[in-house]
From Swiss-Prot:
Family: Belongs to the MurCDEF family. MurE subfamily.
Protein's name in the database: UDP-N-acetylmuramoyl-L-alanyl-D-glutamate--2,6-diaminopimelate ligase
Main location: cytoplasm
GO cellular component, as recorded: cytoplasm
Catalyzed reaction equations: UDP-N-acetyl-alpha-D-muramoyl-L-alanyl-D-glutamate + meso-2,6-diaminopimelate + ATP = UDP-N-acetyl-alpha-D-muramoyl-L-alanyl-gamma-D-glutamyl-meso-2,6-diaminopimelate + ADP + phosphate + H(+)
Chain residues that bind meso-2,6-diaminopimelate: R380, D404, N405, P406, R407, G452, E456
Native organism: Chelativorans sp. (strain BNC1)
GO function terms (MF aspect): ATP binding; magnesium ion binding; UDP-N-acetylmuramoylalanyl-D-glutamate-2,6-diaminopimelate ligase activity
Keywords, sorted A to Z: ATP-binding, Cell cycle, Cell division, Cell shape, Cell wall biogenesis/degradation, Cytoplasm, Ligase, Magnesium, Nucleotide-binding, Peptidoglycan synthesis
Residues binding UDP-N-acetyl-alpha-D-muramoyl-L-alanyl-D-glutamate, per UniProt: S29, T149, T150, S176, Q182, R184
Organism phylogeny: Bacteria, Pseudomonadati, Pseudomonadota, Alphaproteobacteria, Hyphomicrobiales
Entry superkingdom: Bacteria
Subcellular location: Cytoplasm
Binding residue positions for ATP: G107, T108, S109, G110, K111, T112, S113
EC numbers, comma separated: 6.3.2.13
């Protein structure tokens, strides 16, 4: 591709040769190849402008940077007010194709489930569908583990091109606040957007909850075209402010939930791992058995159904597909059962609202004790630690506080902050031992929640990521229990 083909994206001057061949895009100077455009992005810890000369030395044909941040480095410097936005558009231009119908969902909790459920609804209707998010990429013939909720623009558009080339026509993706704030989705052509809820999260990145909300609202304010559907869960404290944003942006507002008018929850009856749910849509009543536990999963399922319906799937097909949903990996996932029937769930809950939701979800079908094993991540919002401790104290009968990716922090200090709110908890720093202890104490009727990691397969300690899986540790503990 020639540099001139980016002329409507990049402010090219007469001194910059439009015939220059562009082989790729990079924002990390260490990954620059000859012929790449290098985007000097300002990060929280480093400024890409400081690495412009290194990028040029590695073969970059031009540097895109904020005005006045890069001097003479031997190759043309193209100044742009928002290099992140330009990178997203350039990535879309370079890779071109994407699945014809793309939807994105934002919110504090539930994004992974909604993206997965939307894909499953489309699949049930016979469509070639994919989902992209925290747990990775799932598509026909493809199931890859991932670590970023929203990939960087270059990786994202390369992936979208691969999916489109493979025949995928429909794709759902998570839109994290980081991803939205950092313009990673700015080149994606979206047909609809969804919102689940808003709670405390990423306070190490966002200065206030309001800033956090506004970052998420870029999905509705900026990325969706006017008239596009905005499917919003209506029963969250932040639903109304989100609805106002969607309306002000000229979007088609579709609300779901008990207060929802597009898909309305009329009745929910809990039956252990499933829920009989009555839903109203445009005067029609649908009675379905949702094979998932927890009120929050009903809301997630309806956001997914709303996204599928609003992008062209008949309502009866979308709602019928809800009876066949499978939970996303590590989302209230039944991982094991003891010989006397006590159940063990692994869940990704690593923030206050999510922990509260999952503990409330299992209470209706727990005849014995609710036991929870959890910790809080290091180098992340420290304010949530006592909040999560209080939630565990209030909603669980037995609490075991352990480590969960302490990173560069002293693990005992993280646990101490949690224990201030739940002093009666048992403290076991070794996560493997904490899970083993919890499984060993289970009696008939008990439910154990191992919270925090979900699908993750590592434990980050002092700069090293060690292999660790809550699923594997639960299974190992069950074997030891019956040995």
């Amino acid at each position: 591709m020639k540099l001139g083909e980016f002329a409507d994206i990049l402010p090219l001057s007469g001194s910059i040769a439009g015939e220059t061949t562009i082989s790729g895009l990079a924002s990390d100077s260490r990954r620059v190849n000859a012929g790449d455009l290098f985007f000097a992005l300002q990060g929280s810890k480093a400024d890409g402008a400081a690495y412009a000369a290194d990028a040029a030395g590695r073969g970059a044909v031009a540097i895109i940077a904020r005005p006045g941040t890069v001097g003479d480095v031997g190759v043309p410097v193209i100044e742009a007010d928002d290099p992140r936005h330009v990178l997203a558009l350039a990535s879309a231009r370079l890779y071109g194709a994407q699945p014809a119908t793309m939807v994105a969902v934002t919110g504090t909790s539930g994004k992974t489930s909604v993206a997965a459920f939307t894909r499953q609804i489309w699949e049930k209707a016979g469509l070639a569908a994919a989902s992209i998010g925290t747990t990775g990429v799932v598509a026909p013939g493809r199931d890859e583990y991932g670590e970023l909720t929203t990939p960087d623009p270059v990786s994202l558009h390369k992936l979208l091109r691969e999916l489109a080339d493979a025949g995928v026509t429909h794709a759902s993706m998570e839109a994290s606040s980081h991803g939205l704030d950092q313009r990673r989705l700015d080149g994606v052509k979206l047909a609809a957007g969804g919102f689940t809820n808003l709670g405390r999260d990423h306070m190490d990145y966002h200065p206030t909850v309001e800033h956090y909300h506004q970052s998420k609202m870029r999905l509705f304010k900026t990325l969706l075209p006017k008239g596009a559907p905005a499917v919003i869960f209506a029963d969250d404290p932040w639903s109304e402010p989100t609805e106002k944003v969607a309306l002000a942006a000229g979007l088609q507002l579709l609300t779901v939930g008990r207060r929802g008018t597009f898909l309305t929850i009329k009745r929910v009856e809990h039956e252990r791992h499933r829920q009989r749910t009555e839903i109203e849509h445009e005067g029609m009543i649908y009675d379905i058995m949702l094979p998932l536990a927890g009120d929050f999963q009903v809301g997630n399922a309806l956001v997914a159904a709303g996204l599928a319906i609003s992008t062209g799937l008949p309502a009866d097909k979308a709602v019928a597909a809800l009876e066949h949903l499978k939970g996303a990996s590590g989302r209230l996932e039944l991982t094991g059962t003891t010989e006397d029937g006590a159940q063990i769930y692994v869940d990704y809950a690593h923030k206050p609202d999510a922990l509260e939701n999952v503990l409330q979800a299992v209470r209706p079908f727990t005849t014995g004790r609710v036991i929870v094993v959890f910790g809080c991540g290091g180098d992340r919002d420290p304010g949530k630690r006592p909040i999560m401790g209080e939630i565990a104290r209030r909603l669980a009968d037995v609490v075991i506080v352990t480590d969960d990716n302490p990173r560069s922090e002293v693990p005992a200090e993280i646990r101490r902050a949690i224990l201030e709110a739940v002093p009666e908890a048992t403290e076991i720093g070794d996560r493997r031992e904490a899970i083993r202890t919890a499984v060993a104490m289970l009696n008939s009727g008990d439910t154990l929640i191992v919270a925090g990691k979900g699908h993750e397969i590592g434990q980050e300690i002092a700069g090293t990521k060690l292999p660790f899986s809550d699923h594997e540790e639960v299974r190992r503990a069950l074997k030891e229990r019956t040995a």
